[in-house]
């Protein structure tokens, strides 16, 4: 996929594309067999022991994305939920888990509404001094239970939706991000115009919808918990210079 954005002349871009890519003959791609994941029937856990200074927790729940959702609004409600939990200094994680309860030194929540297949709503964090991974895990579950039983207030909902929309709009100030978003949407089989409709989709989300997705998807049957157990660090051993740091 080639995406060109910025202060360019479309006719010139098209001519250059024809010049450099036109002579290339199309190839017949092999048909990709459907990747069907075995349905998860219960909570999955894994532990990784590795040289590290601090323990680390990751919790992931399987959730739908725009391309796979039966209810179109659900992925957008999950984006709003991520903002409620981790949307700046006034978010619930920052206010309650870090400052008030002091159970986490750092914690984040992330959802991706745009991908080819179902994705994972991820919460990750590091315990505060004197606290354990289990303490953080329980504090996270308590926050999710609160959202399941108590709808967010209209004031909090509006504040978070404004933040989510502002973040998506400000990112488009970057020419690189514009190209990345347009290319990503087309590559996963979605309409690039979803970039423009995203703010309206977020604005339409209600407190009841946020509560519904929390109740529907944040269950043990769709949960995977991973814990990094720190082991003594050998300072004489060179650290890896590449790769996924979460897999070490």
State the predicted function of each range.
Residues 23-68, 83-132, 155-166, 173, ...:
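Non-catalytic beta-strand/loop surface segments
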Residues 1-20, 222:
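Non-catalytic, conformational "gating/processing" segments within enzyme and secreted inhibitor domains
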Residues 10-14, 133-134, 223, 235-238:
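Extracytoplasmic/secreted cell-surface and envelope-processing proteins
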Residues 15, 69-74, 132-136:
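Solvent-exposed, non-transmembrane alpha-helical starts
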Residues 1, 118-122, 195:
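Short, solvent-exposed beta-strand edge segments and adjacent coil->beta transition regions
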Residues 19-28, 141-152:
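A common structural junction motif
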